[in-house]
Amino acid sequence: MAKFDAHLKCSFCGKSQDQVRKLIAGPGVYICDECIDLCNEILDEELLDNQANTNNSPQVKKKLPTDNPKKSVPLELTSIPKPLEIKSFLDNQVVGQESAKKILSVAVYNHYKRLAWKFKEENKNSNSKDSQATKLQKSNILLIGPTGSGKTLLAQTLAEFLDVPFAVADATTLTEAGYVGEDVENILLRLLQKSEMNVELAQKGIIYIDEIDKIARKSENPSITRDVSGEGVQQALLKMLEGTIANVPPQGGRKHPYHDCIQIDTSQILFICGGAFIGLEDIVQKRMGKHSIGFTTNSDQNKVDTKKIVDPRDALKNLELDDLVKYGLIPEFIGRIPVCAVLDRLTKETLESILTQPRDALVKQFKTLLSMDNVELSFEPDSVEAIANEAYKRKTGARALRSIIEELMLDIMYTLPSEENVKEFTITKKMVDNLFSSKIVKLPSGSKRVIKESA
């Protein structure tokens, strides 16, 4: 073995392991430390040349108009849509959730008023002593609601109405710096990409962080071991949510000390965090019912308290800061998201309305699809009700509606394009019932499950 090691040499420069400080082995090849240093120098020179060419290229300057901010971004107070206008637009896309829409409308209006105020202060006469006298703090938003209740849709509709860059990030992929996973700065990279790498435009955008409840601390008490995908991510997000100058790697991935980063001021970015927070109702109910436990509790008071906490939807209306802390969010993180909106669980009636009323309702989408084949599609009112009932049973909110209609329309969309004589088609309640009743298999009346005991 020693004889074999003596013949090891670098596959690039040919020097033996005795002539270099370090020889790194790969699958059938070797490279020395001198060749690695040379490769690093070549890459650094190439990176600098590319950046110089990018800065001098007229095409890039035309593509990234950083000197001309997007006109649709409201910088004047008169151009900012009022809360009633924002809610009216949300009503066209989102059914129900009146309280959440009102909270979002006011929060977004105040956020862009703050942007207009800062823009006005920056353009004041420098001789004015009152310039920058009052600093308006940012108010990020937390959306709490069950899956399929419209959290992401609300944020997307807001961005569409305001015509600003909007990015969606998944909190489950984030980890603390130094561990396998995505850095929190990659969230800002998505916003930059949406704004065509225009930093000025990205700094006025909206970021929606989904599944924020998945980064909750695993236990209420701080753990000895590091929680790199839970509390560690919350700690990493603190400065970004509050407002800081963040360094974003333009190519994504981890930050590298030898690579230049794009600096973004996050103080102007509106962060909307959303999550289902499964089990939060139990925490609220437990807190509300604490005082009714014991021998000295009045029996009449017990009855009233029990009625108050029976329905989980009513429990979340009494949400407090301590409940989120017990769930696993650290107080510093909650303090940087002062606006909280609780979304209601969708009822059968709401699901029916979602199918037909919004601008992009599913019924309208499938009517448009079949109209391309010169077929007029219609739904009987009873069939819409049957679809909503089936979606309600699945307990996945509005997301269940699309999967049900896709199942229902599969055979229809498969055969209708080939039927030249068919010009109209109607979905009936019987078709919906037959589709899902056939999936229920009943056991024979006399059958019993036999469990064999092991010897």
From Swiss-Prot:
Molecular function GO labels: ATP binding; ATP hydrolysis activity; ATP-dependent protein folding chaperone; protein dimerization activity; unfolded protein binding; zinc ion binding
Pfam families (alphabetical): AAA_2, ClpB_D2-small, zf-C4_ClpX
Sorted UniProt keywords: ATP-binding, Chaperone, Metal-binding, Nucleotide-binding, Zinc
Domain of life: Bacteria
The family this protein is said to belong to: Belongs to the ClpX chaperone family.
GO cellular component: HslUV protease complex
Positions bound to Zn(2+): C10, C13, C32, C35
GO BP term (any one): cell division
Residue stretches making up the ClpX-type ZB domain: 1-51
Protein name: ATP-dependent Clp protease ATP-binding subunit ClpX
Assembly information from the UniProt record: Component of the ClpX-ClpP complex. Forms a hexameric ring that, in the presence of ATP, binds to fourteen ClpP subunits assembled into a disk-like structure with a central cavity, resembling the structure of eukaryotic proteasomes.
Sequence segments annotated as region (Disordered): 52-75
Protein task: ATP-dependent specificity component of the Clp protease. It directs the protease to specific substrates. Can perform chaperone functions in the absence of ClpP.
Species of the source: Prochlorococcus marinus (strain MIT 9301)
Residues binding ATP: P146, T147, G148, S149, G150, K151, T152, L153
